[in-house]
Regions:
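Catalytic machinery of carbohydrate-active enzymes
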Residues: 1-195
Length: 195
């Protein structure tokens, strides 16, 4: 049994290494060539919403020297092993309705020259490709997109701008996900901020 497991793991490791060498690296090299050679870069993302927001620092950094267009694909099926009963879009990453709600926010970002729903436009960088990388997806990371583009944005800089809203002037807004919650957090510490 020990020998079987050793051979299985060795074969699996070899297979992953070949996949990395023959599939992942060439694709990342394609992305790099687009970045080096083009003045306008088109990006594709199909979500989740948080993943799209996480891609913005990388796009913003590239926008310093490029015109950046972002296309968002609707109704891309989530693989069966990753479907969550709590996911707001069911068995797809993003519904068309979700995208239509997100696009006005994205259009306010000055570094995005164009934001549209994907309808077979030519794509230079598929931001969904991070899902092909051999990384842990249980950890939500803005840095996934650096692996695809070779760019490393300063995450202390603002990358999502919204107009101020007087309604929430003296409010603390907490963003929570149905899939990722920490029931150990006691929010009573926020009471010290009450004016």
């Amino acid at each position: 049994m020990k020998k079987f497991l050793f051979n299985f793991l060795k074969k699996n490791k070899s297979s992953n290494s070949e996949r990395y060498k023959n599939y992942i690296i060439p694709k990342i090299n394609e992305f790099s060539k687009s970045i080096e050679s083009k003045n306008t870069i088109s990006f594709l993302h199909y979500g989740h919403l948080g993943d799209i927001i996480n891609s913005l620092p990388t796009i913003k950094l590239l926008s310093r020297t490029k015109n950046c267009h972002l296309y968002i694909q609707s109704n891309k099926k989530i693989p069966n092993h990753a479907i969550s009963k709590d996911h707001p879009s069911g068995d797809v990453y993003l519904t068309r309705n979700s995208i239509l709600k997100l696009i006005p926010l994205l259009k306010q970002q000055r570094f995005l020259h164009k934001v549209e729903t994907f309808s077979n436009q030519k794509i230079d960088i598929d931001l969904n490709f991070f899902r092909e990388l051999p990384i842990n997806f249980n950890i939500d990371s803005v840095r996934w997109y650096s692996h695809l583009t070779g760019t490393f944005p300063d995450l202390s800089e603002t990358y999502l701008n919204v107009p101020s809203n007087e309604k929430y002037k003296n409010s603390i807004v907490i963003m929570r996900s149905l899939r990722r919650q920490n029931d150990k957090i006691d929010y009573s510490f926020l009471s010290s901020y009450i004016k």
